[in-house]
């Protein structure tokens, strides 16, 4: 079995690290939205799962229980959409990165 080229592997790891930093920045810029109650409550989150904005229609403010339920629903929908979008971006960014299974095989491990 040929010995792995550590110089190439280190270069690949550095490139992967740079890609991950770029990806983190991209995820912060991605915005997903969720709404509940026919749009009475709207939530916006970024690709890093940070709540950016929460909008509540003033007409529903008298019903605290309903507002609470709608806020939870809207935020959860926004987080779900954000997670799906982030996963898609991560998969795109991971193209060409080191595959951990391949790395293990190079060292004689099982991948």
UniProtKB/Swiss-Prot annotation:
GO terms for cellular component: bacterial nucleoid; cytosol
Pfam families, per the entry: YbaB_DNA_bd
Main location: cytoplasm
Keyword field contains Cytoplasm: yes
InterPro entries assigned: YbaB-like_sf, YbaB/EbfC
Species name: Chlorobaculum tepidum (strain ATCC 49652 / DSM 12025 / NBRC 103806 / TLS) (Chlorobium tepidum)
Alphabetical UniProt keywords: Cytoplasm, DNA-binding
Function: Binds to DNA and alters its conformation. May be involved in regulation of gene expression, nucleoid organization and DNA protection.
UniProt-recorded name of the protein: Nucleoid-associated protein CT0805
Cellular location(s): Cytoplasm, Nucleoid
């Amino acid at each position: 079995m040929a010995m792995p080229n550590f110089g190439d592997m280190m270069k690949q790891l550095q490139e992967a690290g740079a890609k991950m930093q770029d990806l983190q920045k991209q995820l912060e810029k991605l915005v997903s939205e969720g709404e509940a109650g026919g749009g009475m409550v709207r939530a916006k989150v970024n690709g890093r799962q940070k709540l950016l904005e929460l909008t509540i229609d003033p007409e529903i403010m008298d019903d605290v229980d309903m507002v609470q339920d709608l806020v939870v629903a809207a935020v959860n929908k926004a987080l779900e959409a954000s997670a799906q979008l982030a996963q898609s971006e991560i998969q795109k960014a991971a193209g060409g990165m080191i595959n951990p299974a391949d790395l293990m095989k190079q060292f004689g491990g099982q991948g």
